């Protein structure tokens, strides 16, 4: 019949048949459209990675870091943390990629692919591991909230060091923060920000 023949049929054929066909097809079309919209919303939510507070303490802007390398975001974007008790926990599920020999910094690759560096203290590399205890090793799988390290805050500060903790996403070029972090006191395990993969990377 061809397309032109079909148009002719609908113009001259039984109008009731057209109505029946429309009634049969339209519900499927609406159902498909609704399912696609819900699927896209679900995928959008799934693509956001939740980063939780790795210490009991406070969060402030990374730009306030005493270490200018972190403050300038040369190593990536993130937040500046202050621990109340010197205990550091995993901010996400992932694998330990790096434990610095001096124990003052730990790198994690999350299960979603973000690479997070937690740096304990400013210039504390000079302590050569003194006052630090690390509870994980490279290639260990960790869960969010699992203890990673401890440091003796009192002793480190007595030596004249700042115990601030920059936490940065070192492959931030692949991500964007979904919503600005709230700068306040948190308990470990509370959500502090989300990461969303950039679509054009």
Over which residues does each language-model region extend?
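Transmembrane alpha-helical segments and their short flanking loops
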Residues: 1-48
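Polar/charged, compositionally biased leader and regulatory segments
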Residues: 38-84, 191-201
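Short, glycine/small-residue-enriched coil/turn segments at secondary-structure junctions
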Residues: 48-51, 78-104
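Short, well-structured beta-strand-loop connectors
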Residues: 53-59, 89-96, 136-150, 184-194
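Short aromatic-glycine-enriched beta-strand elements
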Residues: 65-71, 75-78, 102-108, 116, ...
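Zn2+-dependent peptidoglycan hydrolase active-site motif and core
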Residues: 95-125
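Short histidine-centered loop motifs in beta-beta connectors
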Residues: 118-143, 176-185
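Conserved, short, structured surface segments that act as functional micro-motifs
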Residues: 146-181, 185-186, 192-196
């Amino acid at each position: 019949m061809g397309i032109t023949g079909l148009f002719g049929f609908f113009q001259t054929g039984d109008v009731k048949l057209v109505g029946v066909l429309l009634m049969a097809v339209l519900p499927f079309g609406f159902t498909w459209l609704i399912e696609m919209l819900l699927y896209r919303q679900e995928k959008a939510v799934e693509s956001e990675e939740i980063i939780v507070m790795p210490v009991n303490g406070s969060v402030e802007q990374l730009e306030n870091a005493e270490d200018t390398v972190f403050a300038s975001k040369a190593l990536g974007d993130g937040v500046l943390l202050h621990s109340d008790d010197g205990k550091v926990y995993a901010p996400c599920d992932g694998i330990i990629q790096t434990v610095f020999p001096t124990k003052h910094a730990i790198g994690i690759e999350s299960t979603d692919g973000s690479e997070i560096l937690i740096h304990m203290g400013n210039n504390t590399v000079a302590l050569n591991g003194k006052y630090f205890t690390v509870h994980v090793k490279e290639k260990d799988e960790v869960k969010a909230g699992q203890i990673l390290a401890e440091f003796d805050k009192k002793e480190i500060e007595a030596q004249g060091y700042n115990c601030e903790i920059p936490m940065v996403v070192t492959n931030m070029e692949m991500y964007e923060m979904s919503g600005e972090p709230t700068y306040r006191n948190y308990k470990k395990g509370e959500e502090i920000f989300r990461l969303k993969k950039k679509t054009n990377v």
